[in-house]
Regions:
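Glycine-rich, Lys/Arg-enriched anion-binding loops that position phosphate/diphosphate groups
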Residues: 162-171, 176-259
Length: 340
């Protein structure tokens, strides 16, 4: 069994939960959502996909992104009237109310704060998935799953992935919030680090995880680079009405870290448009849009907007990847949609 997930904090926590409950997982594949959307990922029968768009060859699928909602009913074999196959046009309609959010042998989907929350519900919903039945290994895994340590990890994952953070969380990150900032899915050479995190988040309390030398060093670097990152953001950002426009194309050695720092610098604006180079495809530009987490007055459905441009996401945050030659056209169109 192989786990296919995304290298962000939510994806790593999904990995911790799935490997806790599925001892048959023997390999991992970390990919970005766009590669899955573009059909560039070979998925095979038996694969578990978590926190990524759907692929019809998988066995279990766990997700919570609104733009992926139509494919839950396809995964269950309940097809919409508008046709077969994967959704090719923007469609953020949620599954019918009577459609179950958890199905044994299929996985789970709902618009939850995190994909990890959906995975957790799959393995803890009474009668749906696992009962020990005298099996000591399964009982130990269930005990861990129901522990206060794991419940706290899930609560923190919800908070991080849904951006339910305070200014103090952003300006003085600690604990799992700080650890989440050390994960950069655009660096495949970091895969051993992601694997280490999966194991520690599954097996160890927060204090032990923070005490690991590698994690400790990465966390300290995030804190040390915060001022450098702030200066770069201020130099590369323009305030255009209600929109924070940050253009990081051409910036070398951008510090890792705090994606929410921008909102502490421009608290009056309600949405951001960030443009950057796609580090994995040289002919591609990365575009992301997100509500200001401290000023959520925008009315834009960001996920639906990004889907129009070949991407996806949630109601309040999303991204897309576009060819460089077409980037300015997409940027103009997106800006016009989000400005007030």
């Amino acid at each position: 069994m192989r786990l296919v997930t995304r290298a962000d904090f939510d994806g790593v926590v999904c990995g911790a939960l799935v490997t806790l409950m599925e001892d048959a997982v023997d390999s991992f594949l970390f990919v970005e959502p766009k590669f899955m959307q573009d059909g560039m990922v070979e998925v095979r029968r038996g694969d578990v996909i978590a926190n990524l768009p759907y692929h019809p060859s998988c066995t279990l699928w766990f997700d919570h992104h609104i733009t992926n909602a139509p494919n839950w009913e396809r995964h269950l074999g309940v097809l919409r009237a508008e046709g077969r196959g994967l959704s090719a046009q923007p469609n953020t309609q949620q599954p019918k109310p009577e459609t179950p959010t958890i199905v044994e042998g299929k996985g789970g989907f709902r618009i939850a704060p995190s994909a990890a929350r959906v995975v957790y519900e799959y393995y803890t919903t009474p009668g749906e998935r696992r009962e020990a039945g005298g099996n000591r290994q399964i009982q130990d895994a269930l005990d861990t799953l129901h522990s206060e340590r794991m419940k706290f990890l899930l609560d923190e994952t919800d908070k991080i992935d849904a951006a339910l953070l305070t200014q103090e969380d952003v300006l003085n990150p600690q604990g799992y919030v700080l650890i989440s900032m050390t994960i950069d899915g655009k660096r495949p050479e970091d895969e051993p680090y992601w694997m280490k995190l999966i194991e520690l988040l599954r097996e160890a309390p927060l204090e032990q995880t923070l005490g690991d030398p590698d994690i400790k060093n990465r966390c300290q670097k995030i804190l040390d680079d915060q001022e450098k990152l702030k200066k770069i953001l201020l130099a590369r950002t323009a305030l255009r009405g209600n929109v924070i426009v940050t253009d990081l194309r051409g910036v070398k050695d951008l510090p890792d870290g705090n994606r929410f720092l921008l909102y502490t610098l421009f608290p009056g604006s309600n949405i951001s448009l960030k443009i950057g180079d796609d580090s994995q495809r040289g002919n591609t530009t990365a575009i992301s849009v997100g509500y200001n987490i401290f000023n959520t007055t925008s009315k834009v459905n960001v996920g639906a907007l990004m889907e129009k441009h070949g991407g996806g996401g949630h109601h309040v945050v999303g991204s897309c990847r576009v060819p460089k030659r077409d980037a300015e056209k997409h940027i103009r169109e997106i800006f016009e949609e989000i400005r007030e």
